[in-house]
Amino acid sequence: MTITPQNLIALLPLLIVGLTVVVVMLSIAWRRNHFLNATLSVIGLNAALVSLWFVGQVGAMDVTPLMRVDGFAMLYTGLVLLASLATCTFAYPWLEGYNDNKDEFYLLVLIAALGGILLANANHLASLFLGIELISLPLFGLVGYAFRQKRSLEASIKYTILSAAASSFLLFGMALVYAQSGDLSFVALGKNLGDGMLNEPLLLAGFGLMIVGLGFKLSLVPFHLWTPDVYQGAPAPVSTFLATASKIVIFGVVMRLFLYAPVGDSEAIRVVLAIIAFASIIFGNLMALSQTNIKRLLGYSSISHLGYLLVALIALQTGEMSMEAVGVYLAGYLFSSLGAFGVVSLMSSPYRGPDADSLFSYRGLFWHRPILAAVMTVMMLSLAGIPMTLGFIGKFYVLAVGVQAHLWWLVGAVVVGSAIGLYYYLRVAVSLYLHAPEQPGRDAPSNWQYSAGGIVVLISALLVLVLGVWPQPLISIVRLAMPLM
């Protein structure tokens, strides 16, 4: 295979992040300097983000049999890079109070971002598996980064063991699919899986095992049990990455698989996915009702959000609007989650033991940090899907595609789930405006809005509001990503 200059340009984000990994690794070996390594990481991620413009000039192409670079890949690469940038930005002040090695944090985030970019470009079950492992392995270390806390170490061990088990299910499922179809390429699967072949027991078993593995990575019921514990035990900046980059890009590659391979044509698979979506929406919202820890609450909330997205995935065969719905919803989910976890990160920085993740820590926040409380309120309203926020646009799209595909009971679940979600999101928002306790707990620095993390949080809030009122620019970007697939 000949590598042309066009191929290299198409792979620029992957190459730049890979080069940044090597540079940061050498920098750590040469001299430990927290500011230097954080700066190198942020510069590398920004350069990769800018390089997407050059990738767009090249056009869609299959760079290798394992990777396809097109508008769809660029959209999800951009979302992963934004989430990685935000994670590094939130981590810097948190690590300032951390007494152990700080620099490896950025190295692990960069490697996870590399896995995310590979997943966004995946066009083959082999690259899908490699990407998932490359994004998962660094997270084992990141989740347990505050290893002197029992909660963080426990979360890391739990996530590592369960993730390894899920990966084995995924790999075994791929082996069964290969045994029946004779190919692992998404396009070849679409050609080889002809009429009636999807009802073959071996193929159904293979896709069933893959659903188990991918369901774990996406925190779908009943593979969700790790989610609240890991979100609570992981440092706040790591929870940011877990909630955004890893979920978004894995869902994106599943969308590509469903688009090329006629997996959704199987009635059995559609029914299983519909049951999982229904259970995720209802269970995720019901479990979030009783939470007093904001990271656990957001963990259960993420289960329900992935359930909403599954509705659009099931409706994929009925029209292109499903692709648009997923893109808009994921963008709204990204900015809302970055803002919410960003506030938790600011409240928890610098590192002083456990994060400020108790709901009690946010009681009366408005009276001494009014702008921060307003940002958190906007994020809660967006996650709840209230009009005038980007979250509402995404949820409206999901309901529209559900109605278009006649998935009435799933549309009902989305409506009921949203109503339940409204209660616990408003409970968080209302607590921000109650009287502050006599003995306040953790607090964000007085100049938080001038820090890099504060700026990211404010920009996220601004985007959620502006795109909630005028979503056309985002919709145009998402539509541009579709014809190139």
Swiss-Prot record:
Matching InterPro entries: NADH-Q_OxRdtase_suN/2, ND/Mrp_TM
The UniProt record lists the keyword Acetylation: no
Annotated Gene Ontology cellular component terms: plasma membrane
Keyword Ubl conjugation: no
Membrane-topology annotation of the record: Multi-pass membrane protein
Compartments where located: Cell inner membrane
Transmembrane residue ranges: 8-28, 35-55, 71-91, 105-125, 127-147, 159-179, 203-223, 235-255, 271-291, 297-317, 326-346, 373-393, 408-430, 455-475
Keywords: Cell inner membrane, Cell membrane, Membrane, NAD, Quinone, Translocase, Transmembrane, Transmembrane helix, Transport, Ubiquinone
GO molecular function, one term: NADH dehydrogenase (ubiquinone) activity
Family matches, as Pfam families: Proton_antipo_M
Catalysed reaction equations from the record: a quinone + NADH + 5 H(+)(in) = a quinol + NAD(+) + 4 H(+)(out)
Family: Belongs to the complex I subunit 2 family.
HAMAP family referenced in this protein's UniProt entry, alphabetically: NDH1_NuoN_1
Subunit structure: NDH-1 is composed of 13 different subunits. Subunits NuoA, H, J, K, L, M, N constitute the membrane sector of the complex.
Functional note: NDH-1 shuttles electrons from NADH, via FMN and iron-sulfur (Fe-S) centers, to quinones in the respiratory chain. The immediate electron acceptor for the enzyme in this species is believed to be ubiquinone. Couples the redox reaction to proton translocation (for every two electrons transferred, four hydrogen ions are translocated across the cytoplasmic membrane), and thus conserves the redox energy in a proton gradient.
Protein name per the record: NADH-quinone oxidoreductase subunit N
Natural source organism: Shigella dysenteriae serotype 1 (strain Sd197)
